[in-house]
Amino acid sequence: MSLDIQCEQLSDARWTELLPLIQQYQVVRLDDCGLTEVRCKDIRSAIQANPALTELSLRTNELGDAGVGLVLQGLQNPTCKIQKLSLQNCSLTEAGCGVLPDVLRSLSTLRELHLNDNPLGDEGLKLLCEGLRDPQCRLEKLQLEYCNLTATSCEPLASVLRVKPDFKELVLSNNDFHEAGIHTLCQGLKDSACQLESLKLENCGITSANCKDLCDVVASKASLQELDLGSNKLGNTGIAALCSGLLLPSCRLRTLWLWDCDVTAEGCKDLCRVLRAKQSLKELSLAGNELKDEGAQLLCESLLEPGCQLESLWVKTCSLTAASCPHFCSVLTKNRSLFELQMSSNPLGDSGVVELCKALGYPDTVLRVLWLGDCDVTDSGCSSLATVLLANRSLRELDLSNNCMGDNGVLQLLESLKQPSCILQQLVLYDIYWTDEVEDQLRALEEERPSLRIIS
């Protein structure tokens, strides 16, 4: 049973009504409910009385150090069997972290902990790691995004990785580690005891100088399946170093996020070698890089190689034009593995969309999800898309948000969506403006086709 309440300011009467439920439900989520330290004594008592509780989320509540301490006291009850705890954005500081070692020692059932958006600082992180290293702690997933951590925190984190083979997922994005910190962290990641499967390091001050260490990590860790390095200035030099590790047989990476990493068409050459050789790689994001049409052509040529088994490609905001669309057409008609293509925020225009529609009308295309938001599509492009929706047998989701279409374009899409031959399940139309008459038709269509979601 689940109690899931979000974005509701709880009155005293409503709180009194909820307390018995908190004592009974297996999953309790009270996110952004205006909770403060005052409510935490009640929460402590309620969870002490609830041996069935396995998940507790109190995200985005101003609990403060004292309030979080009260909640953690409740969880230390011997009957507590909690497995997942989210205290994201709860105003927990270094001063409140002193209780964490004892809590982590006593909560041997806890597998997942979210502490994002709390200013723990390096001293708070040090206390957290003291508990994580304890043999009684069995935590597998930890999120520490936006926690005011610096390079000083990387040695305690590395020490945890060296002694905790059960540790599987680590989110450290948006902390100021910079080159020195990442170098230290990689020493822990390379340790034979570390069996991490997912690592997220978005916007951590990583540079090309760190990519040799990261290369060694991906080369030595067959367990690592997901690596997120987005919003770090790796550049083409860093990408080249990273790819030398990705190419090794020991690398089993499935998901690689390199958005906004200063990659150009030159860097695509190294990535293309990886795409051609690594059938294990399934998801690649290069969003926010200046690949341009030249880089897109190189990627598409690799996607046509039999060794490439990529399922999801993100090239959003990559300065692609209509000139890249014939290359993507070849991919869509011949590639049998690519299910998702994110091309939003590229000036493809109607001519580019018309070109893509040629491939989408092909009987053997397998694409399921297509993002074309903010691509300068007008009513004319909608006409081609509307025709394709009647013939395509694979596309399930289409995003056309923030384009230049009007009533006529939307009506053409709706006319196709009404037909039994159209199998689309979700159409996203954020920031598209139409008249009340069109709005009425949209809502009527949703009633006629309950399986269809139109998001606007």
From Swiss-Prot:
Modified residues (Phosphoserine): 86
UniProt note on tissues of expression: Brain, heart, lung, liver, spleen, testes and kidney; highest in the lung and lowest in the heart.
InterPro entries with a match to the protein in the record: Leu-rich_rpt, LRR_dom_sf, LRR_RI_cap, NLRP_innate_immun_reg
LRR repeats, residue ranges: 15-43, 44-71, 72-100, 101-128, 129-157, 158-185, 186-214, 215-242, 243-271, 272-299, 300-328, 329-356, 357-385, 386-413, 414-442
Source organism, top-level taxon: Eukaryota
UniProt keyword terms in alphabetical order: Acetylation, Cytoplasm, Leucine-rich repeat, Nucleus, Phosphoprotein, Repeat
GO molecular function: ribonuclease inhibitor activity
Modified residue annotations for N-acetylmethionine: 1
Biological process per Gene Ontology, one example term: tRNA stabilization
Subcellular location: Cytoplasm; Nucleus
Entries under SMART domains matching the protein: LRR_RI
A single Gene Ontology CC term: plasma membrane
The protein's assembly and partners: Forms high-affinity heterodimers with RNASE1, ANG and RNASE2.
Annotated domain remarks: The LRR domain forms a horseshoe-shaped structure that interacts tightly with target RNases via a large protein interaction surface on its interior side.
Main function: Ribonuclease inhibitor which inhibits RNASE1, RNASE2 and angiogenin (ANG). May play a role in redox homeostasis. Required to inhibit the cytotoxic tRNA ribonuclease activity of ANG in the cytoplasm in absence of stress. Relocates to the nucleus in response to stress, relieving inhibition of ANG in the cytoplasm, and inhibiting the angiogenic activity of ANG in the nucleus.
Protein name stated in the entry: Ribonuclease inhibitor
Organism the protein comes from: Rattus norvegicus (Rat)
Designated gene of the protein: Rnh1
